[in-house]
Amino acid sequence: MANEHKSPLDKRVTDLFKDIPTDISTHLITGETFSNESFQAIPVYTLTNVTVKQAVHLSYKLFESMKTTKCAAGYQYAIYLLAQRLLTPAAGSNDLVFKDYIPQGGSDLPQEIKNKIYVTTELSDSQTAGKSEAEKKKATADLIFGDNTDHDLQQVRSQDDETIIRFGSFISAFLMKLIVKQQSNIVDGWNGMLERYTNFYGESPITAVPKPNADWLAGLKNYLISDPKIGHTWVRVISAAENALSVGDKSFQMVRYLASLPLSLTGMHAYKLFLEVQKQSNLGMQWLLEEMVSPKTLPALEGIAKILKNFESRTSTRKPPYFRYARIMSPAYFQELQTKNCPELVYLLVCLLQKYEAFGAGQEPTKIVGIERVPANIRAEMSRAAGYIFSVAPQRNMGMYSDSMRKALVHQEKASTSRAGKEKADEVFGM
């Protein structure tokens, strides 16, 4: 019988592949190591707040524009400046939420853009000469609102300055999430936003202000992402506020609703899903990470471990939240956690979440961007892996169960999960 044992490769051949570095980056964008210092070194704008009258003017022009189907160029800067001027959540408040959190040392806007935003809202001597107080008041209103009377927005013109600014800045901060969200997110969340406005400020929204349509929002989104420095500046502002404000502060809660939650962990879906799996299962993080290791999942799991060790807060120590916005600031950060770079892990985590019935009615986990590209064989493998992890979790973590709870729960879990572990991927996802 012929000897089928394969001879080892010639040393000349094996020497060709020795000493290949293990930290080679093969991504189109060379990866960079994230740090809080590098986050704060990314170029941003440093913009002077608009005056009260200028903020009223910009708010009114925004409301006018939202009635149309086309967002004009330049509104991305006006909306950012209104968002930067967000007022603290208290009835009649004139204090600015972000007054202490505007980044310094950044660049200014081009003069041609500033001319359209920092408009003149005070009458000159020649414009007031020989005019009555009523005439002066009308002339000032024309400077701010324009001399064409829009009957649909008469309610806006009748409001006091602070009310207009409160609503204009709140809407603008809400619109700023278009730097990462689709326009449907704004449309679907509009009524909820109006309710939150009332909750925060104790007053009704200005009902004459229309909900923008999808085409207008698509235009605004294109303008916002055409200048990434706008998004970088907004992230610096809201992350600084999030880092400094007390968790119990109502301003913190408003910033969290308007910006932190929609922007946090953008492009880091694997990490977001891992946290949710840990939350739903209450299993140890180390145990979960080790159970999910394979050659294809390891790079992303390493990335998760680095974040947990270096950047997440502890129960007794609050750390800066900057890492949560890292991929908005630069696509070179945490690339291993992007869905397209770790589809196997993302699919595995989705399968685990379904085991814990963590998705609400109407939610479709398979609609996560990028997950549709996972091949059928990988889906089947990751579905089986999720079944095995789910089924062995009680047996591998017996120390977390009392004798009574072990008798009541673990036996039942073992029986039910042994069946669940045999499901195919198409059965798991109801396909």
Swiss-Prot record:
One of its GO terms (molecular function) is RNA binding. Keywords: Capsid protein, Helical capsid protein, Host cytoplasm, Phosphoprotein, Ribonucleoprotein, RNA-binding, Viral nucleoprotein, Virion. InterPro entries: Rhabdo_ncap_2 (IPR004902). GO terms for cellular component: helical viral capsid; host cell cytoplasm; ribonucleoprotein complex; viral nucleocapsid. It comes from the Viruses. Pfam families: Rhabdo_ncap_2. The keyword Ribonucleoprotein applies. It is found in: Virion; Host cytoplasm. Residues 412-431 are annotated as: Disordered. Homomultimerizes to form the nucleocapsid. Binds to viral genomic RNA. Belongs to the cytorhabdovirus nucleocapsid protein family. Encapsidates the genome, protecting it from nucleases. If expressed without protein P it binds non-specifically RNA and therefore can bind it's own mRNA. Interaction with protein P abolishes any non-specific RNA binding, and prevents phosphorylation. The soluble N-P complex encapsidates specifically the genomic RNA, with protein N protecting the genome like a pearl necklace. The encapsidated genomic RNA is termed the nucleocapsid (NC) and serves as template for viral transcription and replication. Protein N binds protein P in the NC through a different interaction, and can be phosphorylated. This is Nucleoprotein. It comes from Northern cereal mosaic virus (NCMV). The lineage of its organism: Viruses, Riboviria, Orthornavirae, Negarnaviricota, Haploviricotina.
